[in-house]
Amino acid sequence: MAAPSEDVSCEDFTEFQEILRVMRTIDDRIVHELNTTLPTVSFAGKIDAGQTCKQLYESLQTAHTSRDKAIKRCIAQTSTAVNILQGERLKDSDNLTLIKLLRKEQSKLKFLKSELNVEEVVNDRSRKVFNERCRLHYKPPKME
């Protein structure tokens, strides 16, 4: 996994996306991880599949939580910036630099919100693959 969610910069959306891409590595490699760590029938006694699945589940949950916090923190930060800029625009509606900056921040906010949808798809895919391979070995705690 990459940087903790509080270390992720929200200023540059392209950089933020790149950091998310790196943070999603565990999800991208889940099939490979399961294939290399879960035993086949012939090796079933040599590896504790329950423990392996539990560790993978905990890693996935940590990654999902970290990314979710980073995205939501950046959304909150950008929303605040948009609100401030909107207030300034009301006072100075002819300032083109201000209008341009406001549009830029509004676009960034829209893109950040779309990352929440991407995150949902990535998480659902990982859970599905995890459940297909680990359901017999490990039952994750119920989500509230």
Swiss-Prot record:
Presence of keyword Aminoacyl-tRNA synthetase: no
Record protein name field: Protein MIX23
GO CC terms of this entry: mitochondrial intermembrane space; mitochondrion
Top-rank lineage group of the source organism: Eukaryota
Pfam families cross-referenced by the UniProt entry: MIX23
Membrane spanning stretches: none
Membership in a protein family: Belongs to the MIX23 family.
